[in-house]
A protein has these predicted regions:
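ATP-binding/phosphotransfer module of carbohydrate and carboxylate kinases, centering on a glycine-rich
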Residues: 1-118
Length: 118
């Protein structure tokens, strides 16, 4: 199982289905006020924090920019420092977790910039 299996829209949908037996799209889970959806999003957030902590602990980046459709979930940016702080090796989290400047299509724009002009 790779990170993408869990830390993607499809992964959030699958986690929710396995926990609660209902199939919802990731954006529906993220936007819901339902307690079951909150549990699923919390698990996703904790899994993301553990993944990002590995990156922080190995590379010590100044900033990590989240990408893809789930980067639109504002709650991730609110809870991530709280979830990361106890699991990074430093005394406090110095890495900023940020949304993409041009939205969830930023990755596609960046890839297009790599295409040769000639």
């Amino acid at each position: 199982n790779c990170i993408e299996t869990f830390l993607s829209g499809r992964g959030l949908t699958q986690t929710h289905f396995e926990l609660h037996g209902t199939s919802l799209r990731a954006i529906e889970i993220a936007n819901s006020t339902n307690a079951a959806c909150a549990v699923s999003l919390n698990i996703y957030s904790q899994q993301l924090a553990h993944c990002l902590a590995t990156i922080v602990n190995v590379l010590d980046p100044h900033m990590i920019v989240l990408g893809g459709g789930l980067s639109n979930i504002q709650e991730l940016y609110e809870v991530m420092p709280e979830y990361l702080e106890p699991i990074v090796f430093t005394d406090r989290l110095l890495t900023q977790i940020s949304p993409p400047l041009f939205g969830d299509a930023s990755g596609a724009r960046g890839a297009a910039c790599l295409w040769p002009l000639e």
